[in-house]
Design a protein with these regions (language model features):
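Catalytic center-proximal scaffold of phosphoryl-transfer enzymes
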Residues: 1-134
């Protein structure tokens, strides 16, 4: 549920709770409890034989140091094995530089399926696979 709706709901009950406070709670809980889980799955992803990657532009309206019209990127990394539950990890970056993939996939030495973006060439010790989507 969007934070502005939660803010309105709390106000209906007579409790003034700002979106900033709710957002800070979410960030704090995520950092404290979910980071460990994310890091566990990140290590697991690096240990498998086949992974997929893609990056998509997103627009962040209020980001410190960036104009509202600047492009940022959400990177997606996914396991490719069929016999296990999929691992899907997102990484936000303010850039599309291949260094993002290089750093995230450091230690991965399997097959990486991605589109033709040359930034993935910066990832060392991998075997590149072509993406067959049209």
């Amino acid at each position: 549920m969007p934070l502005y709706r939660q803010e309105k709901d709390w106000l209906q009950y007579g409790f003034e709770l700002s979106r900033a406070t709710i957002a800070n709670w979410i960030i704090e809980c995520t950092d404290k409890y979910l980071r460990v889980l994310y890091e566990f799955y990140h290590r697991l992803l690096l240990s498998i034989e086949f992974a997929m990657a893609d990056e998509s532009p997103i627009q962040v309206l209020k980001e410190e140091g960036h104009e509202a019209t600047a492009k940022s990127y959400m990177w997606l990394f996914r396991s490719g094995e069929d016999d296990t539950p999929p691992i899907v990890l997102y990484k936000y970056a303010s850039t599309r530089r291949g260094d993002v993939a290089k750093e995230f996939l450091k230690g991965f030495n399997g097959y990486l399926m991605a589109d033709g973006y040359t930034g993935y060439n910066k990832v060392q010790d991998i075997k590149r696979c072509c993406c067959f989507s049209l």
